[in-house]
């Protein structure tokens, strides 16, 4: 089994800690989890190990790995496109600007020969890496090889005859048709190089997410289980150059799961015509790097469960933009709802293992955003403590924000509270709060006067012109659900706050950085 991915920053479903005036780092170390590897998880992951082994079997030697990294590199692809353009340009320039009674210059033929030899080497290296049978199973690869070999033979023959026999034969009368054919061949080869470049761009964008690379497909798409697919956005137009082309996704689903799939689009920011997928598309509007509402998670999991129960062949394909954060949140909820796993920790760990391809790098491709982790934990409680129903609604009022150990000048710090997609509180309003920076205790106190009633899913954002902005166009933010607040207190350390959890933000937010909210009830 592969090594576990990097530690999930998830502390469980209860955020509260014993009330203290100033938290210490030790109180907030709970995000470091031991990989929750169970026997059932080992069995489930092992089912995919054969598939993964087959995907990398052709790269089993160090030499093949090195060759594969070279021919699959972006620079190698760009260089290939440049050579095709150069070859076509030289050929056209020679036809247009050279006296028609002269022969094709030996210099041009030599350059053309060198270019042809480069592409012949490219084909041979790819055959070496992928294997002859696998490489030539693709019709485009067969055509590309023919396009390379035929002009190469023409160049070799022409150089030979140009020197020995054909010094008195004008080139136009005998070669114009052949040259036109060669131009068409070169252009077709350029289109094939563009296809290879698109593959490289898609792999660069998807990084080391596990891809489906069988049966002529190369998609940012992962079977999390046999019936749950996670993938990136099915794109068209310019975006299809570096993301999954929607036509290929449709072809894949129709070939593998015809009439037995449903697609879930979790993006609020982009969509496509549902007709592509035969109108079997459901859309849940979730903002990037944010969370679904708890109600949406319950409705989604019940709907998918019902769909799965209708036919054992039914599957779901779930995506957001990159097929990682929002997708992972909902997939983990589905794993818990279907009782494949019982805990949030197990489902989060498993999704990260399935989505990450460690043969390329160890970068974690699971659910990283703290609020998304938190909501998977909430859903686990909904499933097990509330019998898959929403918990009783609890109405709370914010009395005070306490921000610990923030660096820099944040005299213009502002807080905004969002509920049901509307701003219900903003500290910019006159008279609704007071802000005090206690330098001695290194705390910022924001006392809220007559705050609005809060219930269900709540988002809190902080703004300051002196702090760098990251996700959501703000320095830091987080989500919580009022039904899970205990003792009228929520305390979140750095690794449970969205944006400060990322290592690149740690120069601004020290380990002691935390946000605490004190609530009241009326």
Curated annotation (Swiss-Prot):
Residues 210-386 form the Phosphatase tensin-type domain. One of its GO terms (biological process) is phosphatidylinositol biosynthetic process. It holds the Pfam family PTP-SAK. Residues 12-27 have a biased composition (Basic and acidic residues). Gene3D superfamilies: 2.60.40.1110, Protein tyrosine phosphatase superfamily, Voltage-gated potassium channels. Chain C. InterPro entries: C2_domain_sf (IPR035892), Dual-spec_lipid-protein_phosph (IPR051281), Ion_trans_dom (IPR005821), Prot-tyrosine_phosphatase-like (IPR029021), PTP-SAK (IPR057023), PTP_VSP_TPTE (IPR045102), Tensin_C2-dom (IPR014020), Tensin_phosphatase (IPR029023). The active site is at 320 (phosphocysteine intermediate). Acts as a lipid phosphatase, removing the phosphate in the D3 position of the inositol ring from phosphatidylinositol 3,4,5-trisphosphate. This is Phosphatidylinositol 3,4,5-trisphosphate 3-phosphatase TPTE2. It comes from Homo sapiens.
